[in-house]
C-alpha cells in the first residue's frame, strides 16, 4: 500500500520536472496505486495545469535539440513518451529551431580533416543516428562542395 495519495505523489514528481501523462501513469502504476485513484490524480493534475503534454513536448524538443538531436529522433523519442503525433508535429513546426544550422554545428564538430568516401558514409550514418533527415545531410554536402571550391 502506497504511503501517500496518488495526487500527493504526482505533486511531488511534478515539483521536480515535467512529465508526460504516459510517464506519470507508469510511475503511479509502479507504485501500485488503484486505477481509479490514478485516473483521478492525472485528471486533477491536468485540470490544475500541473501536467500538460503540449508544454512537456515543447520543453523536451528545446532541451534535446540543444544536445544535437534532430527532428526525426525527437519524434521517435516523444512517441515513446506517449505524446500524440499531432502534438509532436505541431510543436516541431512551431519551434524556432533552424534544423539546418543545428546540423551544420554538429557536422563541424565531428567532421574529420581527411575527407573520403568512407568518412562521408560514416558521417551520413552519424547524422541519421542523431535524427536528421537526408535533406539535412545533402545540404551539408552542398556546403562541403562550395567550401572545397574556394580552397
From Swiss-Prot:
Keyword Cytoplasm set for record: yes
Mark the transmembrane ranges: none
- GO terms classed as biological process: regulation of DNA repair
Q: Where in the cell is it found?
A: Cytoplasm
Origin, by domain of life?
Bacteria
**Keywords for this protein:** Cytoplasm
Q: Which Pfam families match?
A: RecX_HTH1, RecX_HTH2
Any one cellular component term from GO for this entry? cytoplasm
**Where is it mostly found?**
cytoplasm
What protein family is recorded? Belongs to the RecX family.
The record's function comment reads:
Modulates RecA activity.
Can you say what this protein is called?
A: Regulatory protein RecX
Classification lineage:
Bacteria, Pseudomonadati, Pseudomonadota, Gammaproteobacteria, Pasteurellales
